From Swiss-Prot:
Gene this protein is translated from: rpmG
GO biological process, one term: translation
Organism of derivation: Rhizorhabdus wittichii (strain DSM 6014 / CCUG 31198 / JCM 15750 / NBRC 105917 / EY 4224 / RW1) (Sphingomonas wittichii)
Record-given protein name: Large ribosomal subunit protein bL33
GO cellular component, one term: cytosolic large ribosomal subunit
InterPro entries, per database record: Ribosomal_bL33, Ribosomal_bL33_CS, Ribosomal_bL33_sf, Ribosomal_zn-bd
PROSITE patterns reported for this sequence: RIBOSOMAL_L33
SUPFAM superfamilies: Zn-binding ribosomal proteins
Length: 55
C-alpha cells in the first residue's frame, strides 16, 4: 500500500484549556504550521488554535 498523502494533526487551544480539534493536512502543499481562530467551548469564546502533533 502507498503512504497516505494527508496526515492527522491536532489544533490545540491557546487558552490552555486542553481542548483540541483534530483535522488533516497535506504536508507537501502546506509546509507552515496551521493556526485558526475557532470556538473553545470550555471558555465559551473564539480563541486561536495552533497546530500540534498527535502522539
Amino acid at each position: 500500500m502507498a503512504k497516505p498523502t494527508t496526515v492527522k494533526i491536532k489544533l490545540v487551544s491557546t487558552a490552555d484549556t486542553g481542548f483540541f480539534y483534530v483535522t488533516k493536512k497535506n504536508p507537501r502543499t502546506q509546509t507552515e504550521k496551521l493556526s485558526f481562530r475557532k470556538y473553545d467551548p470550555v471558555v465559551r469564546k473564539h480563541v486561536d488554535f495552533k497546530e500540534a502533533k498527535i502522539k
